């Protein structure tokens, strides 16, 4: 969607979740939206790289009453806890931030993690800007952008509706080795391959998987979850 179209939608009072380049998000008016930076998208034609002038717009159902907020890295226990008893939460967190690391490692242990549905994504930057530009998230109600913390839309639904989360994954587990990890971390040294302690980097290289094009597909409560190598 063009910036003009997105701005018109914002001014209409619509509640939105947005994604796009930082320059595009900076140009939008204040309103009922949250956003994160990223130039990479999938549309009907396939993969798209948008570096300026357009944003990806996801409307939040009008039947829901939304509360938009930013939680600092020291407030993350409230992200799930403050979610509505009947509804869902949309969350966006900057890649590599303290909030990203903490939420990824600890959110699953929240008592409400499987009772209050939370969906979202990790904001990023163009690969050519890695190390030069930081991922951002935006709280549209104030017009602020942040390098850390999580922006959310807590969406309460009427009693006649129920939120259910499903995951669409184009990858499936193979029938090869089973890998298990004893530590929860973004960085891994050794893991267990079919029960035997093995250096992950050496294993990946020996299997010819160091091109990074295929993920590890894990089982999380019955759902197939990808972990990039």
For each feature predicted by the language model, list its residue ranges.
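Small-residue-enriched flexible segments
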Residues: 1-23, 29-32, 38-41, 47-88, ...
């Amino acid at each position: 969607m063009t910036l003009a179209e997105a701005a018109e939608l914002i001014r209409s009072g619509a509640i939105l979740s947005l994604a796009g380049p930082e320059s595009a998000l900076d140009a939008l008016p204040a309103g009922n939206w949250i956003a994160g930076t990223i130039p990479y998208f999938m549309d009907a034609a396939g993969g798209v790289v948008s570096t300026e002038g357009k944003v990806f717009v996801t409307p939040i159902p009008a039947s829901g009453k939304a509360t938009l907020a930013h939680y600092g890295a020291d407030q993350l226990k409230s992200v799930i806890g403050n979610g509505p008893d009947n509804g869902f939460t949309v969350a966006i967190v900057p890649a590599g931030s303290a909030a990203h690391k903490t939420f990824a490692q600890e959110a699953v242990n929240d008592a409400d993690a499987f009772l209050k549905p939370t969906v979202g994504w990790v904001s990023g930057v163009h690969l050519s800007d890695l190390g030069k530009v930081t991922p951002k998230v935006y709280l549209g109600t104030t017009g602020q952008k942040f390098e850390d913390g999580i922006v959310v839309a807590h969406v309460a639904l009427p009693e006649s509706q129920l939120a259910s989360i499903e995951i669409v994954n184009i990858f499936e587990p193979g029938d090869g080795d089973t890998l298990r990890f004893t530590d929860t971390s973004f960085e891994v040294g050794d893991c267990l391959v079919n029960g035997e302690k093995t250096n992950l980097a050496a294993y990946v290289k020996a299997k010819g998987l160091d091109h990074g094009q295929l993920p590890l597909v894990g089982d999380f409560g019955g759902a197939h979850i990808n972990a990039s190598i």
